[in-house]
Amino acid sequence: MSQASAQHTPMMAQYLKIKREHPEVLLFYRMGDFYELFYDDAKRAASLLDITLTQRGQSAGQPIPMAGVPYHSAESYLARLVKSGESVAICEQIGDPATAKGPVERKVVRIVTPGTLHDEALLDARRDNLVLAVHPQGDRWGLAWLELSSGHFSVLEVDGESDLLSEIQRLDPAELLAAESLSLPPALAERPGFRRQSDWLFDLESATRLLCDQFGVADLRGFGCAHLTTALTAAGVLIDYARDTQRSRLPHVTGIAVETRDEAVVIDAASRRNLEIDTNLGGGFDNTLASVLDTTATAMGSRQLKRWLNRPLRDIAQIQSRQAAVQCLIDADRHATLRDALKAIGDIERILARVALYSARPRDLARLRDALNALPALEHDLAELDEGTAIDALKHHIRPYPELAETLSRALVDNPPVVIRDGGVIGTGFDAELDEYRGLAEHAGDYLVELETRERERTGLVGLKVGYNRVHGYYIEIPRAQAREAPAEYIRRQTLKNAERFIIPELKEFEDKALSAKSRALAREKLLYDGLLETLNVDLQALQGTARALATLDVLACFAERALALDFVRPRLSDQPGLRIRGGRHPVVEHVSDHPFVPNDLMLDETRRLLVITGPNMGGKSTYMRQAALIALLAHTGSCVPADEAEIGPVDRIFTRIGSSDDLAGGRSTFMVEMTETATILHNATEHSLVLMDEIGRGTSTFDGLSLAWASAEHLVERRAFTLFATHYFEMTALTEPYDSVANVHLTAAEHRDGIVFMHRVEEGPASQSYGLQVAQLAGVPPRVVARAREKLATLEQQEVHQAGTRGGLGDSDAAAPQQADLFASAPHPVVEALEKLDLDAISPRQAMALLYEWREQC
């Protein structure tokens, strides 16, 4: 593509010039009814889209690879390209082909990237689609992220790569921007949608100036972020990127929200994955916490719900305000009414973003019209609710817009077409000029019949006809025999063998109007449509405030509905540390299970900070632990919780070390992954943290694993973190001896013949046995193997009993004690071994005294 322009046709020279300005993206070059791609773009698109790769003549002596997609169905192809991680520059014809000398003028009108989508067809309606920029300063990281399709713009600063990774995992951006020279962890640099930006763009002064221009302010102090210099640098790069891709000043991005880590319950990346908040371990949505809770009436409510679940609050006043709002909706029995009203609202948050970007389609405006018409009834319903809850702050924003509603109702037909280009969007009676053009185009036939009848009567020429052809336009045709009698005002237009054709001033005037009526109607309709967008943009900020308030109301109504439908209870929020749960349940397991869920109690307080949980595999240990974390999480979002009763103290972090998996790409074994996650917990857990530790130490030798598990538990006891510690090392149950704040609980099971019945009930004390062979039998291990395992187990247990007897005569130990070797039992001391072997009757008193002195030295 570097050949001189003279070697190319004018059209191809134009293409190459535009392509040079956008080398890193695919270029959709508009030619008539197609978007064409050339050269390497064509090859890549043909491969990704499975479309035909062809050629378009030659340029510079070489065949030009070409591929294309129809203009009218471009969205589906764009969706596939974006899903593949591609970005696409849309180059449109902006000149008039009729008047163009040479190639029609074209320019790139926007760049479609994974993180800057706003077209409805390209987005997941119920998930945020973010573009995020990062910038470091020492160990401090600044993050800025934008949801272009709604206008949400936020910043945050964190310390260290661990917190950075945690926040990026929470936000899950579709695109990630960073400086070219910045060294990033592989987990970020290898993310889909990762984009490098020029280093010089990351400049605080330029960023501040750009942000002030975006928000129309002199400085950023009013947003409470002027001190966040690292995050603001990232924010400036982000706004510049979004403006460039959209070719717009982004009028719907009117402010910036500041987040801090201290405001929310921190959930690190591993814990978020293990809890399956809105993404399951397979990367899907099914069987997640959000899948059970999300009965929101609108897509914007669904997105808000996921934000709340992924960022539980710590401020008790805010949480209680939400709780009170949910309780108010339940008590007033209004949640169902409100949810029905909200269904008529739709996703106006994203519609308004498209309005701001002048990309809203006719059906967007029709949905907005319907939403505005639904607001008066919704306002009335809210007015009847009690004061003193989170709903109070919403009432100010959820209000009617009668003038806008009336304008849209008059302007739009009931069911407009998908696009404006073919007309039929603006209703009759809204604009007299448009009605006139349409009348001319639609009723031309009626006029011609009426003119023909009138002229026959006026002239007396019974053979007179009015007609039309593409070459000569409209005409009055008179048979040759009667042509001499044509009135003087008839102007001859065409002579035929058997007739003469004439034009008259009235018909000429009609012709001028009729032939251009359709194009004029389309142009007028487009002008009126743009006028509607301008009118809506005047009230854009207020409308955005209404949309956000409606999304919040939707979540609160969803919480109320779920509380009633799933038998959730309002938790008490306490300033006393701990979790006190009676009849707690796992919300997801209960929802998807075909069997009744067995509820269990949980007591963690100042005197009981770590529970050692034992019991058989499949007995429910992991479920019991996860439900505790999910109940704490839900309580901090303001939701009711799955329990008979719950009192939740302050929680600053939720940690989980559950499950096992290799990190093959990162070159880490299962055990390395486990130890990395454990290290994060041990370094960061506080006295207000909730920690779930499941089967620590499984990936190494028994002695190493048990030692690590014991030491980790001791460390958590010393840090006073609230901990649920599940283990198959029965020696761990001895932690209750040195530590008063440790207690034992176990999941019950009962043997039935050669099988096992899991009771899923949590009881005090350690488990009596592991039931490993019974679980193996349930799993389908061959009977011969299970039988051989039983034989081996009996041998090992007999050896253990014998060894215990020789060590200290413990053969009569408590029958309830687990039959498992005490791996922490001390090895016999050399003095003890010598004493055991000594024949006391065969030595003299002097020899006995000498041995005592020798043994004392050894001790």
Curated annotation (Swiss-Prot):
<protein>
    <recommendedName>
        <fullName>DNA mismatch repair protein MutS</fullName>
    </recommendedName>
</protein>
<dbReference type="GO" id="GO:0003684">
    <property type="term" value="F:damaged DNA binding"/>
</dbReference>
<keyword id="KW-0234">DNA repair</keyword>
<dbReference type="InterPro" id="IPR017261">
    <property type="entry name" value="DNA_mismatch_repair_MutS/MSH"/>
</dbReference>
<keyword id="KW-0067">ATP-binding</keyword>
<dbReference type="InterPro" id="IPR007695">
    <property type="entry name" value="DNA_mismatch_repair_MutS-lik_N"/>
</dbReference>
<dbReference type="InterPro" id="IPR036187">
    <property type="entry name" value="DNA_mismatch_repair_MutS_sf"/>
</dbReference>
<dbReference type="GO" id="GO:0005524">
    <property type="term" value="F:ATP binding"/>
</dbReference>
<dbReference type="GO" id="GO:0005829">
    <property type="term" value="C:cytosol"/>
</dbReference>
<dbReference type="Pfam" id="PF05192">
    <property type="entry name" value="MutS_III"/>
</dbReference>
<dbReference type="InterPro" id="IPR007860">
    <property type="entry name" value="DNA_mmatch_repair_MutS_con_dom"/>
</dbReference>
<dbReference type="Pfam" id="PF00488">
    <property type="entry name" value="MutS_V"/>
</dbReference>
<dbReference type="GO" id="GO:0006298">
    <property type="term" value="P:mismatch repair"/>
</dbReference>
<dbReference type="GO" id="GO:0140664">
    <property type="term" value="F:ATP-dependent DNA damage sensor activity"/>
</dbReference>
<dbReference type="InterPro" id="IPR000432">
    <property type="entry name" value="DNA_mismatch_repair_MutS_C"/>
</dbReference>
<dbReference type="InterPro" id="IPR045076">
    <property type="entry name" value="MutS"/>
</dbReference>
<feature type="binding site">
    <location>
        <begin position="615"/>
        <end position="622"/>
    </location>
    <ligand>
        <name>ATP</name>
    </ligand>
</feature>
<dbReference type="InterPro" id="IPR007861">
    <property type="entry name" value="DNA_mismatch_repair_MutS_clamp"/>
</dbReference>
<keyword id="KW-0227">DNA damage</keyword>
<dbReference type="InterPro" id="IPR007696">
    <property type="entry name" value="DNA_mismatch_repair_MutS_core"/>
</dbReference>
<dbReference type="GO" id="GO:0030983">
    <property type="term" value="F:mismatched DNA binding"/>
</dbReference>
<dbReference type="InterPro" id="IPR016151">
    <property type="entry name" value="DNA_mismatch_repair_MutS_N"/>
</dbReference>
<comment type="function">
    <text>This protein is involved in the repair of mismatches in DNA. It is possible that it carries out the mismatch recognition step. This protein has a weak ATPase activity.</text>
</comment>
<comment type="similarity">
    <text>Belongs to the DNA mismatch repair MutS family.</text>
</comment>
<dbReference type="InterPro" id="IPR005748">
    <property type="entry name" value="DNA_mismatch_repair_MutS"/>
</dbReference>
<dbReference type="InterPro" id="IPR027417">
    <property type="entry name" value="P-loop_NTPase"/>
</dbReference>
<dbReference type="Pfam" id="PF01624">
    <property type="entry name" value="MutS_I"/>
</dbReference>
<keyword id="KW-0547">Nucleotide-binding</keyword>
<dbReference type="Pfam" id="PF05190">
    <property type="entry name" value="MutS_IV"/>
</dbReference>
<dbReference type="Pfam" id="PF05188">
    <property type="entry name" value="MutS_II"/>
</dbReference>
<dbReference type="InterPro" id="IPR036678">
    <property type="entry name" value="MutS_con_dom_sf"/>
</dbReference>
<keyword id="KW-0238">DNA-binding</keyword>
